[in-house]
Design a protein with these regions (language model features):
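Catalytic-core regions of core metabolic enzymes
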Residues: 1-224
Length: 224
């Protein structure tokens, strides 16, 4: 278990069945490990029981000053350090060359497809962050991080929903003054909203509100 590791640990990557995740995080809290990426799926997107598991995890995180990416995600790819937390087979998904585009995506499938397309088209990637169900860390945290990242010059976001409306607008406004942000908002119609809810448990919301938020914060909206 984590408790048997003698050294200090900066980050855990958790990829075990969903019902066991809470126990691992409680062990992590005991060792005062402050950061976790939860790859495991089977939470909010599965209904009421999954929502309750997420709430318990969130309480552990708050009580122990812990930051969590995920669950139901691939995690991160840093193309400049070759650090990745995903379990992708790079024999099946091409690795893009180093570049200046960073990707934020709620959808793991879209992130994989975009990485593969970028490699085929010769488009350079700096970082990819897939945050899935967004139990804690979301767009409002990640945009300031990419704003200050020396390798990132352009930011692309694939968005099903947003974490905190006002915080997101302020973060995007600050970021877009330094680097262009291009966002693809899915779930604009009834079918898209249903797909987002079944995929990451996200409530896609009123598209008109997103459109207004993009205009206010300087985000360039993509259509496709």
């Amino acid at each position: 278990s984590i408790l048997d590791i003698p050294d200090e640990v900066a980050l855990t990557v958790i990829a075990i069945p969903a019902p066991w995740v809470l126990d691992v995080l409680q062990q992590q809290a005991h060792k005062r490990i402050r950061h976790a990426i939860i790859i495991s799926a089977g939470f909010r997107e599965k209904g009421a029981e999954g929502i309750e598991m997420e709430e318990r995890i969130r309480r552990v995180a708050i009580e122990n000053d812990m930051r969590i990416l995920g669950p139901n995600c691939l995690g991160v790819l840093d193309n400049y350090t070759n650090f990745t937390t995903s379990f992708l087979s790079w024999e099946r998904v091409s690795i893009p060359k180093k570049g200046s585009l960073s990707i934020l995506s709620q959808s793991g499938a879209f992130a994989i497809a975009l990485l593969d397309l970028a490699a085929q088209e010769g488009l350079g990637i700096a970082k990819m962050i897939n945050y899935g169900n967004r139990i804690d860390v979301g767009e409002s945290d990640l945009l300031p991080f990419l704003r200050d990242d020396v390798h990132t010059k352009v930011i692309a976001i694939y968005m099903e929903s947003v974490d905190y409306g006002r915080r997101f607008i302020e973060a995007a406004k600050s970021c877009s003054k330094k680097k262009p942000i291009v966002a693809l908002k899915v779930g604009r119609g009834a079918a898209g909203i249903a797909a987002a809810k079944s995929h990451t448990g996200a409530i896609a919301g009123n598209y008109a509100l997103y459109k207004a938020a993009f205009l206010k914060s300087g985000i360039i909206e993509a259509h496709g």
